[in-house]
Regions:
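Well-ordered alpha/beta subsegment
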Residues: 72, 96-99
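General structural feature for long, well-ordered alpha-helical segments within catalytic domains
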Residues: 13, 78, 82, 117-120, ...
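Active-site-adjacent beta->alpha loops and helix N-cap segments on the catalytic face
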Residues: 45-57, 102-126
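Glycine-rich, positively charged N-terminal anion/phosphate-binding segment
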Residues: 1-2, 17-92
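Short, solvent-exposed beta-strand edge segments and adjacent coil->beta transition regions
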Residues: 9-11, 64-68, 109
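Extreme N-terminal starter segment of soluble prokaryotic enzymes
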Residues: 1-2, 6-12
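A generic structural signal for short
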Residues: 13-14, 70-71, 113
Length: 126
């Protein structure tokens, strides 16, 4: 499987689960064969406001597995700036969350709530 120009090997991946897919868990999954891992759900706004916890959630480690950072939000400009900041940490790719139904995320228009606004979701991806 390929995501853009990144070749994914293996048949298993670690899903981006908040509170579960921390660095230690990603390292263990990579060690035991995950084709790629995705970091925890990270607030783009938190990253841009300088929140250290949010910045740490974006960190990738280098191993045999492909590592991705995941962002959520609803403001295209903030999402773009947070993605540019995430790129400085060298993830293999950046995942934009459009599936989280948690009130903390979707209740503020991010995650799965973006599926109600396809035009906005398109702007974020572009």
């Amino acid at each position: 499987m390929k995501i853009k120009d990144v070749e994914i090997k293996g048949f298993a991946a670690l899903a981006p689960m908040a509170g579960v897919a921390d660095r230690a868990m990603r390292e263990i999954c990579a060690k035991y064969g995950a084709g790629f891992t995705v970091g925890e759900l990270t607030s783009a706004r938190g990253v841009m406001q300088g929140d250290k916890k949010s910045a740490r959630l974006l960190e990738c480690f280098k191993s045999d597995a492909i590592c991705a950072s995941q962002l959520f939000g609803r403001d295209p400009e903030i999402m773009t700036q947070a993605a540019l900041r995430a790129e400085t940490l060298n993830p293999d790719f950046i995942d934009i969350n459009m599936g989280c139904p948690a009130p903390k995320v979707a209740g503020h228009g991010g995650g799965s709530a973006l599926m109600k606004e396809p035009e906005l979701a398109t702007k974020i991806v572009q």
